[in-house]
Amino acid sequence: MIKNIIKIGMFGVLALTAASCQDTMDTHPTTTFDEATVWGSKATANAFVNATYDNVINMFTGSSSCVGWESRTPNGVRCSQVGEGIDGIATELGIDRTSDFGISRFGLLRRCNMIIEKAQASTALSEGEKAEIVAKGRFLRGLVFYDLTRKMGRFVPITSVIQADQEEKARVPMTSSVDESYKLVVEDLEAAIPNMPVEAKPGEPTKYAAELLLSRACLQAYAYTKKAEYLDKVITYASDVTQNCSLSDNYGGLFNETDETNAEILWGYYRLKANTKIGNYEELIRTYPNISQDDCINSKSPIHFKNPNGRTYEGWAIYFPTQDLVDQYLVTDEKTGEALPWNETSQYKENVESIDPNTVTTEGQLDAYEQENGNARRMPTPQDFQQLNTAYPTNLHYGKLKAGSTRNISELMYSGRDARFASSIVYDGCSWIGETVETNLGGNCSMGVR
């Protein structure tokens, strides 16, 4: 009897051990999920979508290239006289057969197409969930198409998941024209909008983010095709955004941790402070100047830095806003209350005498001085701004205070601007990171201060 008990007990232990080994060893990779799991619920499908969002949003913010592309628009300019030199992409002198502006994004397009196809075929998702996931896939694919179009004009439009053995299916020709490219961009983004969520968690795009990006794409499409239908779409979709999304009372907080979930943020880009540095982002490190207290002293600036070490600005700026962008911030006329360009207000005209740029022909004609070390500094002349492409006229304004005026010319230019101007643009007399900024000749942040 005892032997039987022992045998049965031993067999029980062996059976338990075998079962334990089977459960323990029959595992799956911990870093991947099978398709049934991914497309088996809205939560797991959204996890796949969110990972794809991270790859796509970098085309527009947070990457080393996005700010460079923005500097090739009327909004920004890249200006570096040190290591980087002239932008070889903008001049086309730096483009050759190895230049890659996204031609090989087939892996990313495959992810977008998988989102669309797998969601449509899922038997676990509800019809409403399917529609939303598919919309997100169309949104993402439309943005990839948009980035390819704005950089290259034509691209290979992969719109389905292609398997390794489907060689014929992979023979997809490039779009025939910029017109066809933008047609595909707009089709995807328009198809996405009706089923995109109206509200989303921070970091996820909403219907209004899709409408905003579609409006932007349509403006560029019109610039190339001149088709009025694109302007109609801009009005329709941009109006829906402005009518349903409120503006923030804390505009400056939109860009930092003080108001990180503001309702005006339609698609936020978030990173943890613990493992994120200013130096990781071109939008930050390449927009801050590199100026020391010694530079201010040598430049004879009347305003020195408050920072006891004199190192408030330790970036390496090469990207700057254009005059075209700055001029879009209108100034309130002190007499009429009308919003006008800065040089058309009554206060400016009454106090400033405009100088015809054609009369400025000599170096130092308007203003010049020597720094402590003997380096000459002067106001630029039109000859300093000559360019080879006459299609882009230089935006120059010269002026001086009229005799007897007690106003400050910088104050006349910048006071009363659009309320968001001060949070977007660094200008003469403003406060930036706790320091008073001078951009006038010889000022602590002026051209040539170093």
What are these regions (language model features)?
Residues M1-T30:
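Bacterial Sec-dependent N-terminal signal peptides
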Residues C21-V67, L254-F255, T359, L396-Y398, ...:
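Membrane-proximal, proline-rich intrinsically disordered regions
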Residues Q220-A223, I235-L396:
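Polar, glycine-rich mid-to-C-terminal structural blocks
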Residues Y398-R450:
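C-terminal substrate/ligand-recognition segments
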